[in-house]
Amino acid sequence: MSGGAYWPRPWSCEDGGNRRLGVPEGQVGPGIRPEEGLEVTAVKDAFATDMVIRREPGELYALRHGLPLGNPLVASVEGWVEKLDPETLEVTASTPRLPAGRFWPGGIGAHENGDIYMVFGRWAHRLSPGLEVLASHSLPVDRPHNSFVVLDGGELVTKDCDAPEARH
């Protein structure tokens, strides 16, 4: 990863890292030769899934959430993280529904300490790789927050969404 104290595997956070290149660093591509093809092995209808990250081989995590009723920047929602089997996309573990507050897509990332962090709405949650909730914290600004980045020192940095509809 270029910058940030992320888990040292490709695609362990939103957009592939702090530089937001949208590509998994450290991989040159899938290596498909002209005589080879791709095959779909699983399809999963997972409505309201914002993003998927990897940690170790075989570990795939999805950020899920409820949908707000009415104005999405005012209505309160819950979010959760699911661990998926990478071959079947079946859910192998899940957090409980976690408080989020007002809706904004948020994000998840695998930290270099091994834990999964989730920033969604006005809440930050720390999760074990098995998706036990280790800590939850309501962020100080009562507005939804837009995901996060992890700095080289391991600190998480997020920003609130200052959309006019999000203000009281």
PLM regions with names:
Residues 12, 59-61, 115-117, 155-157:
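Conserved beta-propeller blade signature
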Residues 85-88, 128-132:
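Short loop/turn segments that connect beta-strands within beta-propeller blades
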